[in-house]
Amino acid sequence: MQLDLYVDKINNGFNSNILDILAFISIILGIYTIVSKNPVVSVLFLIGLFSTISIYLIMIGLTFIGLSYLLVYIGAVSILFLFILMLINIRISELVSTNNNYIPLAILSMITLVYILGQKIITNVVQFNILNSFTSSLFEKSFKESINYSNSLSWDTNLIDITHTSAIGNIMYSSYSFWLIIISLILLLAMVGSIVISIGRVI
């Protein structure tokens, strides 16, 4: 019973089969991102991969990180890559001969990453039941209270307390507002520069 409650807390009440389907879809999209010969199509698969990962993170309760994936990776980085690739004239024939050479390296990197994660990440949730033997311990009480407090302090449901999102926003738009404007100008110059380069080549 305790194991079921723990698993339900991990997946935020959603069906674990849906999470498995999202994980499988993300793996397929990641493979197509590497294998695709067209860079524009590869970026589109990358956007789909980030979208699936963000949905997965939101469903397990990590809403801030999931929305950060949507805003940063999809809304800024991937769209900027797609914008630049559509402006630059890339010959597909130049990529066909060298694209397949990266597949063994990608497979080796994926196997290495899975091995490292398998050694470091705890896969057996029964090990957490060791806390049941310390029913009268002060450590168990404080540990449970800290877990419940961190789970209840969700930035999208509790708008009264100052959360990480509001703290970052207050610091970014008050103390570091000048640097935020500088970064925005640099991004604007990068976009205008890519347009000028592409127009110069056409002329």
UniProtKB/Swiss-Prot annotation:
- Could you tell me the membrane topology recorded for this protein? Multi-pass membrane protein
Protein's UniProt keywords contain Iron: no
Q: Please state where this protein is localized.
A: Mitochondrion membrane
Keyword annotations: Electron transport, Membrane, Mitochondrion, NAD, Respiratory chain, Translocase, Transmembrane, Transmembrane helix, Transport, Ubiquinone
**Catalytic activity as recorded in UniProt:** a ubiquinone + NADH + 5 H(+)(in) = a ubiquinol + NAD(+) + 4 H(+)(out)
What is stated as this protein's family in its record? Belongs to the complex I subunit 6 family.
This chain's protein is named: NADH-ubiquinone oxidoreductase chain 6
Mention any Pfam family matching this sequence: Oxidored_q3
Q: Which GO terms describe its molecular function?
A: NADH dehydrogenase (ubiquinone) activity
Enzyme Commission number:
7.1.1.2
Which segments cross the bilayer? 16-36, 40-60, 70-90, 102-122, 179-199
